[in-house]
């Protein structure tokens, strides 16, 4: 599968970009990305270019970013806007099915689209079939309802990329909403792009900026806090430790009909890894084997 992410400006061996590459391989042609200010904005969209690209059909991730403190709300707004558009389209389609003068073939395709409109698997194929059928119907007659349906039929999956600390209130609000959003957290355990300052993601005893004597408090258990809602899909992954579990967790999170949170261990330049970030995947493997990072 072709990744729809290329030529990033990340540090060589960055622990974050492999996850983005994988996600765009799986869902890139139908993704909406909400990205907060930070490393993942710097390496993905350093002016004048953006690292997200399109496939041979012109389909690719729709990317936007906001400030650190309001990115969950920003991404949630993207989701709600698209959800409203799709709900309106579904209503128009049902009106056409009930009383519209449409062919049996178009009727069948519309019914199939309505039945699977919230399923990621096969969505591109259903959209292509619907588009072709609508083009044929519009060639035969000028129908405003059919035109409205055709223009908006390519809105599918929503996704929110976000960070760990400053925007937690917004993240908590979005996860508590019960809506079908997906959150991927790159856990570098420090503020990476500003020089490696300690945060609530930093573990006890770690030496970082603002914690020169070792961090005194515990690391926030973000996964456990999300689990307390009872309806959030939560996974913790490390690509270097288990590619199979990483792929399985991301696929399941996207398919889950509700909020999902994936916490991805991401070795960083600020970790001072012996041998450099060329060993980042091996470092992730060691972290899991030592019990430092849990997979679930």
How would you describe each model-predicted region?
Residues 126-129, 134, 158, 185-199, ...:
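Core alpha/beta catalytic barrel or barrel-like domain that forms the active/cofactor pocket
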Residues 48-61, 246-296:
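Glycine/aspartate-rich loop-and-adjacent alpha/beta segment that forms the canonical ThDP
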Residues 16-22, 29-32, 42-54, 145-197, ...:
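Thiamine diphosphate
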Residues 68-152:
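N-terminal leader/propeptide and maturation segments of large enzyme subunits in energy/redox metabolism
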């Amino acid at each position: 599968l072709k990744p729809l992410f290329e030529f990033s400006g990340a540090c060589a061996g960055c622990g974050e970009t492999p996850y983005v590459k994988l996600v765009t391989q799986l869902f890139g042609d139908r993704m909406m990305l909400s990205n907060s200010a930070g490393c993942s904005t710097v390496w993905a969209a350093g002016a004048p270019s953006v690292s997200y690209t399109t496939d041979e059909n012109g389909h690719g991730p729709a990317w936007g970013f906001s400030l650190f403190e309001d990115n969950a709300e920003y991404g949630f707004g993207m989701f709600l806007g698209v959800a409203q558009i799709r709900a309106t389209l579904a209503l128009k389609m049902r009106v056409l099915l009930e009383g519209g003068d449409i062919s049996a073939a178009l009727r069948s395709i519309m019914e199939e689209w309505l039945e699977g409109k919230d399923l990621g698997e096969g969505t591109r194929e259903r959209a292509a079939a619907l588009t072709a059928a609508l083009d044929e119907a519009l060639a035969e007659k000028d129908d405003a309802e059919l035109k409205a349906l055709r223009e908006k039929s390519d809105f599918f999956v929503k996704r929110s990329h976000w960070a760990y600390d400053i925007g937690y209130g917004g993240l908590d609000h979005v996860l508590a909403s019960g809506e079908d959003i997906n959150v991927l957290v790159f856990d570098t355990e420090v503020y990476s792009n500003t020089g490696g300052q300690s945060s609530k993601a930093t573990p006890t005893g770690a030496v970082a900026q603002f914690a020169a004597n070792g961090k005194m408090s515990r690391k926030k258990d973000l996964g456990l806090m999300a689990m307390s809602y009872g309806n959030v899909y939560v996974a913790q992954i490390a690509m270097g430790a288990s590619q199979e579990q990483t792929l399985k967790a991301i696929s399941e999170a996207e398919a889950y009909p509700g909020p999902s949170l994936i916490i991805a261990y991401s070795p960083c330049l600020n970790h001072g890894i012996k041998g450099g970030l060329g060993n980042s995947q091996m470092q992730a493997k060691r972290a899991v084997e030592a019990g430092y990072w849990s997979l679930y």
